[in-house]
């Protein structure tokens, strides 16, 4: 039950289908929830199941969302250029989409990919010097890349705007 409530509260999909987000799910309040509400959900999750389990669950939920995005883009398994993936993620997650975060660039690195994000939910409103990490955001991007590039990845945040970076940077290592 939690999984369905968690996922549907963010995706707007109650059946967990891969259809793109519907529009006008709520006639007066609109389709999206606030950062405050989303972060409260993550905080409650940490309090209920513990920090490590919450991290795993948030990343897994993000990966599921990322796979939905890849399917909605029609790019699952197609391995397009990284500029195309960047453009799709910008459209879906950025100012014209869910306003989840801004993706400035995805680049290939020796053993995987590096993604440059701004205005992420994980960093919004956090104090400078905070050691909080991206979880759902990392998972969303990971799930999208895994599905599109048909590769298993391991992600980690390597830079943070909270620690003086210009971006929240996530690196994904290709496994096997």
Predicted feature locations:
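N-terminal accessory segment detector
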Residues: 1-135, 154, 159-169, 173-176
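Active-site helix/loop of acyl-thioester processing domains in fatty-acid/polyketide metabolism
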Residues: 135-150
